[in-house]
Amino acid sequence: MIKTKIMGILNVTPDSFSDGGQYHSVDQAVKRAKEMIDEGVDIIDVGGVSTRPGHKEVSHKEVSLKEEMNRVLPVVESIVKYDVQISVDTFRSEVAEACLKLGVSMINDQWAGLFDSNMFNVVSQYGAEIVLTHNGDGHRDKPVVEEMLVSLLAQANKAELAGIPHNKIWLDPGIGFPKTREEENEVMARLDELVATEYPVLLATSRKRYIKEMMNQDSSPSDRDEATAATTAYGIMKGVRGVRVHNVLLNTRLAQSMDFLKENEYERHHLS
């Protein structure tokens, strides 16, 4: 049975939209990492630069390379010994390499290699996995899904040319990155087209504006977990291989049940 991977979010920033400042100290971050492991997480994604809604595109100028290193490396050093896969959410190859040297095995690049062209070479050198997220300034010359597919497949091809195997390249449709609500609805409805590329797909909707708008009511980020879980279920039905979430326990339980139901359906169809 194919297991949906649960990627737990560990933001070590003071300003992330959902949990900024909660895990800013190493001790707090380690405590949360242990909690997620107990809750069944498959991958812990450590991030040192905010991508909160409305955050400026010049975040790489606001948070220096040195500051990102100072936020991320002590946490990675403290948790990489645990029996769980560690990912680092960064668009800088220098941060990626420093973390990969410590034993990290996945890089989650919100700019899909577009910000730092050396990212693919670094990830390839260490035999790691990479997540490529659809991003941009929101201006596009073709419909959103078509533009997303062209952009992500172009970057995935560059990653493969750099030596990263096909099955180690994850595609993230970029919910929460510059898209209108209608464009995000279109992307969600057509997730199967991204799945059809045969790259593993990671869905990252957790607590985002899209979830708030889907609920059609004012809500704090922590009040959006059940609606996030609905997108997890929907994504699994569409064929995504992983989900990036804040509430690990809820989504782990849901994903286990969805995986069982999908496997049950598959077996019965192939018995008949």
Curated annotation (Swiss-Prot):
Single GO biological process annotation from the record: tetrahydrofolate biosynthetic process
CDD domains registered for this protein in UniProt: DHPS
PROSITE patterns noted in UniProt: DHPS_1, DHPS_2, PTERIN_BINDING
Keyword set, alphabetical order: Folate biosynthesis, Magnesium, Metal-binding, Transferase
EC number assigned by the record: 2.5.1.15
Residues reported to bind (7,8-dihydropterin-6-yl)methyl diphosphate: T51, D89, N108, D172, K208, R244, V245, H246
MF GO annotations: dihydropteroate synthase activity; metal ion binding
Pathway assigned in UniProt: Cofactor biosynthesis; tetrahydrofolate biosynthesis; 7,8-dihydrofolate from 2-amino-4-hydroxy-6-hydroxymethyl-7,8-dihydropteridine diphosphate and 4-aminobenzoate: step 1/2
Catalysed reaction, written as an equation: (7,8-dihydropterin-6-yl)methyl diphosphate + 4-aminobenzoate = 7,8-dihydropteroate + diphosphate
GO cellular component: cytosol
Record-annotated Pterin-binding domain positions: 1-256
Cofactor: Mg(2+)
Enzyme class label: transferase
SS bond partners: none
SUPFAM superfamilies registered for this protein in UniProt: Dihydropteroate synthetase-like
Positions bound to Mg(2+): N11
NCBIfam families: DHPS
Family: Belongs to the DHPS family.
Subunit structure: Homodimer.
Job description of the protein: Catalyzes the condensation of para-aminobenzoate (pABA) with 6-hydroxymethyl-7,8-dihydropterin diphosphate (DHPt-PP) to form 7,8-dihydropteroate (H2Pte), the immediate precursor of folate derivatives.
UniProt-recorded name of the protein: Dihydropteroate synthase
Organism (species): Staphylococcus epidermidis (strain ATCC 12228 / FDA PCI 1200)
